Design a protein with these regions (language model features):
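Glycine-rich phosphate-binding loop of ATP-dependent small-molecule kinases
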Residues: 1-216
Length: 216
């Protein structure tokens, strides 16, 4: 199973990705993690990427795709993978499509976890995290037993600065502007599968599993 996950902030992609990892026994691959790993160990690709980063420039799509394909060649990805956070643009999607075709590893599906902006704001603006154990709560949907205090270790919870409503709405607007062409790209290839992610996590998981039944 070779998957790409799309969805705005607050859609619950991370939760669903972990469930898919467990179901299919395939790795979840983050391009951010790949890039950091190459740079830290000073690989050939990492040295090239570092040069762009040091100049304050974006790492070119071609270089990112080469890093992704290098990761997909690892033994744990032979039976499939989950790409989260890449591609973000149509040129990246085209480059990935070409590389996967050459490797005879075409995508199985592109899952779009759909939620309204209002729901995303409710989820993110109410999100608080324990700085000690990293457990995450939602004051509306999954609150701690005691107000803004972690159930596990009693540490006061903290909220990310960019989780205020105004910033969240800006992030959502940017996301939709960037990904609308990408969704159209995958829709044209009959790969896009839309999943209503406004319901509870367990129901989203059920809908995701149902959507993937029969997909190879």
């Amino acid at each position: 199973m070779r998957l790409v996950l799309l969805g705005p902030p607050g859609a619950g992609k991370g939760t669903q990705a972990q469930l898919l990892v467990d179901r299919f026994d395939i790795p979840q691959i983050s391009t951010g993690d790949i890039l950091r790993e190459h740079v830290q160990r000073g690989s050939g690709l990492g040295i090239q990427a570092r040069a762009y980063m040091d100049r304050g420039e974006y790492v070119p799509d071609e270089l990112v795709v080469r890093m992704v394909m290098d990761r997909l060649a690892q033994p744990d990805a032979r039976q499939g993978f989950i790409l989260d956070g890449f591609p973000r643009t149509v040129p990246q999607a085209v480059a990935l499509e070409t590389a996967l075709a050459q490797a005879e590893q075409p995508l199985s599906a592109v899952l779009k976890f759909a939620i309204s902006d209002d729901m995303a704001v409710r989820r993110l603006s109410n999100r608080w995290t324990c700085p000690a154990c990293k457990r995450t709560y939602n004051l509306e949907f999954k609150p701690p037993a005691n107000d803004r205090v972690c159930d596990t270790d009693g540490v006061p919870l903290e909220r990310r600065a960019d989780d205020d409503e105004l910033t969240v709405r800006r992030r959502l607007a940017l996301y939709r502007e960037q990904t609308a062409p990408l969704e159209a790209f995958y829709h044209e290839r009959d790969l896009l599968v839309a999943i209503d992610a406004e319901v509870r996590e367990a129901e989203v998981a059920t809908r995701t599993n149902d959507a993937l039944d029969g997909v190879s």
